[in-house]
């Protein structure tokens, strides 16, 4: 409601500049429930990339925090900035009670109002870093995100008792879909920390909240293997990595220290982002089910199809041959922003 009151009706895209945590979660929820398009700005990218993302999306308003801006280098933001500190301070006790009752008791159609959300409506735009060229905006629809979440959920079968660690930034597709929306829509408790590099603090967090599922990058996983104590991860069930290649030495180091084998996934921002994932090897009725191999990226998620083709002839290649990857599925992006070609 507050976002709706403080922004113009013409503003379809709202910028968000916040680290992982309750603030970014609430901001993204507010924008999505108001049927706007969230644009989580990459605060680690060059200032020119942040400026480019705002211009491409024609952003007029950015949600952020004064405290967070104090620790960032100066970034070129639009003039209309809404600070979470101010928004929280202005919310009366009566409004809090009304919001609680609305969230607990109101049917979904009441929250949405007379503006139904269509599956192909754009939910978010995620940008590349823009380190070598102008950042590209990847447009992901509600259907893209929900289909990817459902496919991911069907293969890892999370429990309501699970607790997931969330440290990846929401401007990254892995953090946005897998460690923000996935646990939220699966009823899983999430333990958040703003900086994935602070391994010792994260170790205390995982112990305090009995974290059972970790989704992170191999680089961060290496830091955890070196600095987190084994007794801090006694409840750990699954570790999944993405965004970069999982080196065998990192997987072996982590498994030796904590007794849980990290499993590698594959994807891209354009795929919402998960496409394939390795799973634990299991045995059912004395029949082995192979879920992962060292020389493979894993199983394709349900609902998707992959083939490897020759880059010039598009002829389908045999297993083991190198070529272009063709991927088909409901998770494939709607396209690049302002680049219909």
Model regions and ranges:
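Conserved pre-ATP/AMP-binding loop-to-beta segment of ANL
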Residues: 82-89, 94-127, 133-134, 157-163
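Conserved helix-loop-beta element of the AMP-binding
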Residues: 58-60, 76-89, 163-165, 191, ...
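Conserved AMP-binding/adenylation subdomain of ANL enzymes
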Residues: 32, 146-163, 171-212, 227
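Conserved AMP-binding/adenylate-forming
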Residues: 2-45, 167-169
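Structural core segment of the AMP-binding/adenylate-forming
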Residues: 2-6, 33-100, 112
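Gly/Ser/Thr-rich phosphate-binding loop
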Residues: 211-216, 225-292, 305, 314
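Conserved structural elements of the adenylate-forming
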Residues: 1, 104-110, 119, 138-159, ...
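Conserved beta-loop-beta connector loops within the AMP-binding
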Residues: 303-326
């Amino acid at each position: 409601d507050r976002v709706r009151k403080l922004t113009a009706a013409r503003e379809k895209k709202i910028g968000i500049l916040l680290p992982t945590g309750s603030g970014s979660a609430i901001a993204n929820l507010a924008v999505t429930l108001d049927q706007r398009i969230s644009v989580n700005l990459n605060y680690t990218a060059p200032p020119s990339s942040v400026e480019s993302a705002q211009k491409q999306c024609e952003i007029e308003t950015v949600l952020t925090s004064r405290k967070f801006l104090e620790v960032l280098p100066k970034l070129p933001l639009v003039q209309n900035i809404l600070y979470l500190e101010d928004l929280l301070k202005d919310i009366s006790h009566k409004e809090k009670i009304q919001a609680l009752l609305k969230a607990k008791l109101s049917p979904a159609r009441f929250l949405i109002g007379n503006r139904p959300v269509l599956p192909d409506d754009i939910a978010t735009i995620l940008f590349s870093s823009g380190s070598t060229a102008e950042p590209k905006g990847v447009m992901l629809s509600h259907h893209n995100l929900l289909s990817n979440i459902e496919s991911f959920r069907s293969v890892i079968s999370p429990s309501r008792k699970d607790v997931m660690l969330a440290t990846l930034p929401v401007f990254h597709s892995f953090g946005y879909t897998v460690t923000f929306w996935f646990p939220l829509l699966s009823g899983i408790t999430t333990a958040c920390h703003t900086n994935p590099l602070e391994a010792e603090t994260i170790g205390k967090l995982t112990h305090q909240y009995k974290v059972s599922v970790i989704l992170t990058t191999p680089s961060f996983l290496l830091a955890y293997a070196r600095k987190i104590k084994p007794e801090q991860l006694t409840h750990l069930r699954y570790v999944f990595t993405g965004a970069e290649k999982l080196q065998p030495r990192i997987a072996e180091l982590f498994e030796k220290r904590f007794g849980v084998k990290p499993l590698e996934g594959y994807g891209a921002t354009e795929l919402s982002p998960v496409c394939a994932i390795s799973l634990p090897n299991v045995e059912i009725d004395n029949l082995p089910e192979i879920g992962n191999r060292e020389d493979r990226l894993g199983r394709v998620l349900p609902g998707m199809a992959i083939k490897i083709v020759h880059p010039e002839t598009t002829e389908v290649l045999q297993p083991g041959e190198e070529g272009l990857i063709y991927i088909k599925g409901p998770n494939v992006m709607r396209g690049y922003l302002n680049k219909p070609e």
